């Protein structure tokens, strides 16, 4: 139950002043709350008989909006002052805070972030309904079990006019002509939102009441807490309630607990336990004890210990109230008379009258205490609220950019709209091809991803050379036996050399095609993601672009694969320029001789094919040639295969995708079909625009708030 007061004219209590109504200043400082001694707050005397131009407590003449936390029940004396001065102080200090939050709530900002509020929670039969009734002056639905099943935002406005009401939920707005309609309409709204069972819902019901007989305030009533789920009630109903509002840091929790339960063990106080879960330090929880008239004799001191914060500690302390009981309601006891009886009860009670002296008892003092707490809480929350609004506004703006502008209705405008869409898409494809796209910190550019695949190709080529070396003796011996003719020992059989070269080059075809496949998948997925980024909200256009990307990819893949296979067919020719091969051969032979400790220092040893090879077997000589040729071939393939892949799968692929996109513009009859949006895109765009509008209005409201600016 969120509570906020506005300046009103109420009838004042005829009872003379007593020592039980001490003076109190209202402070709003962000310092830890004082010790939970009695804080006295003047009651908004709306349930009384004689005419008075304002219910405002006298202490409002000393209002101070410095953001200091109010003391947790520190007893003070009331001050007196002219009523017009009280009203002016209220207008200047209190009302702007309440009106600010009400205006944000009216804008619907609570859909986007939590607003400062006071929530009332309580177990079944805790007296929560009676407390709400006494605070608001409006009778809400009553009964056994959970009666409040949806949060109820109750905005009461005092005005000298006939009683009027309005209830709003979802897309339903119902005007009310009589107070007797309120209960039935609330029940009806709850059934529509939460079903006819006992389930609860987080959806808000808004009830506005305008009447000369109600206080100016705002309430948010939360569902009550049950210990065991009944009938078709969900088993996690307690968690559902906790998830509604009370876990928000912006909410002050007002926990209603009967005096006749064991608070020390919390055995029968689920509401208090739940509040402790979401607020373990008790920084934003106030305890409200009810039904003090039902306390058994001899247990009064236990209640006093609770009120003194000695049993279950809350930083904001406790207050105690006595509301109308069922018999009082049956006897149609007025709220004004109930207030007088409550005051008389505490004044005459041998144990509890000290609580009245300390300002911890009666409903009017509770109402003032809540006003104090809420105003302080609002001022404390404003800086955080401003930051949250800025962040959510920025995120909503960025999200809206993804959905783009509204589709124009004019056919000519649709052409320009589509041209712009395709232009931006083609620009992004161009950046991908050139390696100039913008990427996140943890991502890599497309060209770099492909280059990483090319690095693995180098490892494959190196591994192939090492494989030839490792099986050289076995392979050459096998081919020597098969192909050697009349050559003398030491002469190289070219057929043996050529056969080994062709065999091991042939083993590189599959790895090259696999590298092509991986590179193709990387490019294809990147192009698809880019298309989704630009066209996801246009189902037909998106599918058309995806199909074109797929078709072009398939054709480019086939061309690249054919060219790679052609490259390896040409490699079977076993060719290398003499000048290049001679240099490589000398280098390999030199390395082998050095490793064998037989390197020659004579100038002739450096001339190709002129060395005395009589002491070298044909196997060693073929090994020299194989190493030399594979080294040169690997250099050629290390660049040539990546060249083919880059050209067909990146450069030419991207160019063809860009041209295919431009061809879409030639089919003018299909513009409307191509620009047909997803079913929920327009809804999402509208939702985001409304959200941005709400948050913009909220920013303006905060900027214009005088205390926030000052």
Curated annotation (Swiss-Prot):
Record's protein name: Interferon-induced GTP-binding protein Mx2
Region listing for G4 motif, in residue ranges: 290-293
Function: Interferon-induced dynamin-like GTPase with antiviral activity against vesicular stomatitis virus (VSV).
Renumbered residue ranges of the record's region G3 motif: 221-224
Domain Dynamin-type G: start-end pairs: 112-383
Region (G1 motif): 122-129
Sites where the protein binds GTP: 122-129, 221-225, 290-293
Keyword terms, alphabetized: Antiviral defense, Cytoplasm, GTP-binding, Immunity, Innate immunity, Nucleotide-binding, Nucleus
UniProt region (Disordered), positions on chain: 1-87
GO cellular component, one term: plasma membrane
Family: Belongs to the TRAFAC class dynamin-like GTPase superfamily. Dynamin/Fzo/YdjA family.
Gene giving rise to this polypeptide: MX2
Species the sequence originates in: Bubalus bubalis
Stretches assigned to the GED domain: 619-710
CDD domains: DLP_1 (cd08771)
């Amino acid at each position: 139950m969120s509570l906020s007061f506005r300046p009103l004219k109420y009838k004042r209590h005829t009872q003379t002043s007593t020592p039980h109504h001490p003076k109190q200043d209202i402070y709003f400082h962000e310092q830890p709350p004082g010790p939970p001694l009695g804080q006295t707050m003047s009651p908004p005397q709306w349930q009384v008989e004689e005419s008075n131009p304002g219910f405002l407590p006298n202490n409002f003449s000393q209002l101070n909006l410095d953001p200091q936390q109010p003391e947790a029940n520190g007893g003070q004396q009331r001050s007196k002052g002219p009523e017009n001065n009280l009203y002016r102080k209220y207008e200047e200090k209190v009302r702007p805070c309440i009106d600010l939050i009400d205006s944000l709530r009216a804008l619907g900002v609570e859909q986007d972030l939590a607003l400062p509020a006071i929530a009332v929670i309580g177990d079944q039969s805790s007296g929560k309904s009676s407390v709400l009734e006494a605070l608001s002056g409006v009778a809400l639905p009553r009964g056994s079990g959970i009666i409040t099943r949806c949060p109820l935002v109750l905005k009461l406005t005092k005005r000298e006019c006939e009683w009027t009401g309005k209830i709003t939920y979802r897309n339903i707005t119902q005007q009310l002509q009589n107070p007797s309609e309120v209960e039935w309409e609330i029940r009806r709204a709850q059934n529509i939102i939460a079903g006819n069972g006992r389930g609860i819902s987080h959806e808000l019901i808004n009830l506005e009441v305008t009447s000369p007989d109600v206080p100016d305030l705002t309430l948010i009533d939360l569902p009550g807490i049950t210990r065991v789920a009944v009938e078709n009630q969900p088993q996690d109903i307690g968690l559902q309630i906790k998830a509604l509002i009370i876990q928000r840091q912006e909410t002050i929790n007002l926990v209603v607990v009967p005096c006749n339960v064991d608070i020390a063990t919390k055995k029968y106080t689920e509401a208090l336990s739940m509040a402790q879960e979401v607020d373990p330090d008790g920084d934003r929880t106030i305890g409200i004890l009810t039904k003090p008239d039902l306390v058994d004799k001899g247990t009064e001191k236990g209640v006093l210990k609770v009120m003194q914060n000695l049993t279950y500690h809350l930083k904001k302390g406790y207050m105690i109230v006595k509301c109308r009981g069922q018999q009082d309601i049956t006897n149609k006891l007025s709220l004004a008379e109930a207030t007088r009886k409550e005051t008389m009860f505490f004044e005459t009670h041998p144990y509890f009258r000290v609580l009245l002296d300390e300002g911890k008892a009666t409903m009017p003092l509770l109402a003032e205490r809540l006003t104090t707490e809420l105003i302080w809480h609002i001022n404390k929350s404003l800086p955080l609220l401003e930051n949250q609004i800025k962040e959510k506004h920025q995120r909503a703006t960025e999200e809206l950019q993804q959905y783009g502008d509204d589709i124009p209705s004019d056919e000519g405008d649709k052409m320009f709209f589509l041209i712009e869409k395709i232009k931006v898409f083609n620009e992004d494809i161009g950046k991908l091809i050139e390696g100039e796209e913008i990427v996140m910190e943890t991502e890599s550019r497309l060209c770099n991803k492909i280059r990483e695949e090319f690095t693995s190709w180098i490892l494959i080529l190196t591994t192939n050379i090492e494989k030839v070396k490792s099986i050289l003796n076995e392979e050459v011996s096998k081919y020597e036996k098969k192909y050697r003719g009349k050559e003398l020992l030491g002469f190289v059989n070219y057929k043996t050399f050529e056969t080994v070269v062709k065999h091991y080059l042939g083993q590189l075809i599959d790895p090259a095609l696999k590298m092509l496949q991986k590179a193709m998948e990387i490019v294809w997925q990147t192009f698809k993601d880019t298309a989704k980024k630009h066209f996801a909200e246009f189902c037909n256009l998106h599918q058309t672009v995806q199909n074109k990307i797929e078709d072009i990819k398939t054709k480019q893949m086939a061309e690249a694969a054919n060219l790679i296979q052609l490259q390896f067919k040409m490699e079977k020719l076993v060719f290398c320029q003499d000048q290049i091969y001679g240099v490589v051969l000398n280098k390999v032979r030199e390395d082998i001789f050095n490793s064998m400790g037989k390197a020659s220092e004579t100038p002739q040893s450096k001339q190709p094919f002129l060395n005395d090879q009589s002491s070298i077997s044909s196997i060693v000589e073929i090994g020299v040639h194989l190493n030399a040729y594979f080294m040169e071939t690997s250099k050629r393939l290390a660049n040539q295969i990546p060249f083919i892949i880059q050209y067909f799968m990146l450069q030419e692929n991207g160019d063809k995708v860009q041209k295919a996109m431009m061809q879409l513009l030639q089919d003018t009859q299909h513009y409307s079909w191509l620009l047909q949006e997803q079913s929920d895109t327009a809804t999402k765009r509208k939702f985001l625009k409304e959200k941005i509008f709400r948050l913009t209005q909220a920013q303006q409201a905060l900027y214009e708030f005088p205390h926030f600016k000052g």
